[in-house]
């Protein structure tokens, strides 16, 4: 019987404790907090729409100030088109940048090679200059002879070498000149490259030989022999039979 009474008491106590636990702290919290100002959802939506409209207006003015239609759809299509163009330009610029970087690297390599070659050439030039100075100091006559010796003067085109002078004929020789007679070979002379061309004389011009006029005092040489008579002799008129024995008698 005791446990049943205890159960009834517990059931009797529980609703009162539950009321204290439930209503006590909730009522305290409500009293402590201030009631906030309520903003309607429609007002918040209006504020958002106004802010978006301002942003679209600024974007439209940045893209095209004198636009016929300021609709949001037109502004969005224009912005997407411009963004695509900008992206394509960025891509092409990146490719150009890569090619230019490769070319710049190649140019720097060539410049370094040219600088090395230039240094090598300068060293060779300095070595050659030192060698020339040593030779000039070692043999002074060599340097003066190389610089002070006059260059050979080329002869004028009208000059005639001794070997090319025509031979004057003697008074006893005839004055005939053969047309096929060639001049004697010319001596080889080393001349600079700026020499004037010499005229090649194929035929020797001989002065006309004047026949010496015989003087009256001098007589012409009498070398002409008298002609022999060609009349038939007595022996030629003889017959052959008579002539042979006579020839044999003469031989005896």
UniProtKB/Swiss-Prot annotation:
Domain (bHLH) ranges: 36-86
Organism for this UniProt entry: Oryza sativa subsp. japonica (Rice)
Which residue ranges are recorded for the region named Basic motif? 36-49
Q: Which family does it belong to?
A: Belongs to the bHLH protein family.
Q: Which residues form a coiled coil?
A: 76-131
Among InterPro entries, the record links this protein to: bHLH_dom, HLH_DNA-bd_sf
- Residues of the region (Disordered) are 135-252
Q: GO cellular-component terms in the record?
A: nucleus
Q: What is its main location?
A: nucleus
What switches on expression, per the entry, is described as: Strongly induced by iron deficiency, both in roots and shoots.
Gene3D superfamilies of this UniProt entry?
Helix-loop-helix DNA-binding domain
Residue stretches of biased makeup (Low complexity):
162-176
Q: Misc remark for this entry?
A: Plants overexpressing IRO3 are hypersensitive to iron deficiency.
UniProt KW keywords? Coiled coil, DNA-binding, Nucleus, Stress response, Transcription, Transcription regulation
Function of the protein: Transcription factor that acts as a negative regulator of the iron deficiency response. Suppresses the induction of iron deficiency responsive genes, such as NAS1, NAS2, IRO2, IRT1, YSL15, and NRAMP1.
GO MF terms here are:
DNA binding; protein dimerization activity
Q: Which gene encodes it?
A: IRO3
Annotated region described as Helix-loop-helix motif, given as residue ranges: 50-86
Q: What is this protein called?
A: Protein IRON-RELATED TRANSCRIPTION FACTOR 3
Where does the UniProt annotation locate this protein?
A: Nucleus
Compositionally biased spans, kind Acidic residues? 208-219
């Amino acid at each position: 019987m005791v446990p049943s009474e205890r159960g009834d008491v517990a059931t009797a106590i529980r609703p009162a404790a539950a009321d204290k636990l439930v209503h006590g702290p909730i009522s305290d919290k409500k009293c402590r907090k201030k009631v906030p100002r309520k903003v309607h959802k429609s007002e918040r939506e209006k504020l958002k729409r106004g802010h978006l409209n301002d942003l679209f207006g600024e974007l439209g003015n940045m893209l095209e100030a004198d636009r016929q239609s300021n609709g949001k759809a037109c502004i969005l299509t224009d912005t997407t088109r411009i963004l695509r163009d900008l992206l394509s330009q960025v891509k092409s610029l990146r490719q150009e940048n890569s090619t230019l970087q490769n070319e710049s690297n190649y140019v720097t390599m060539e410049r370094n090679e040219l600088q090395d070659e230039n240094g090598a050439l300068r060293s060779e030039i300095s070595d050659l200059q030192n060698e020339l100075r040593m030779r000039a100091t070692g043999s002074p006559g060599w340097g003066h002879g190389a610089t002070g010796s006059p260059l050979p003067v080329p002869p004028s085109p009208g000059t005639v070498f001794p070997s090319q002078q025509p031979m004057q004929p003697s008074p006893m020789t005839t004055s005939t000149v053969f047309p096929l007679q060639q001049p004697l070979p010319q001596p080889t002379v080393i001349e600079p490259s700026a020499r004037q061309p010499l005229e090649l004389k194929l035929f020797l011009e001989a002065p006309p030989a004047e026949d010496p006029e015989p003087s009256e005092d001098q007589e012409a040489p009498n070398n002409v022999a008298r002609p022999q008579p060609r009349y038939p002799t007595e022996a030629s008129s003889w017959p052959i039979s008579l002539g042979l024995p006579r020839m044999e008698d003469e031989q005896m």
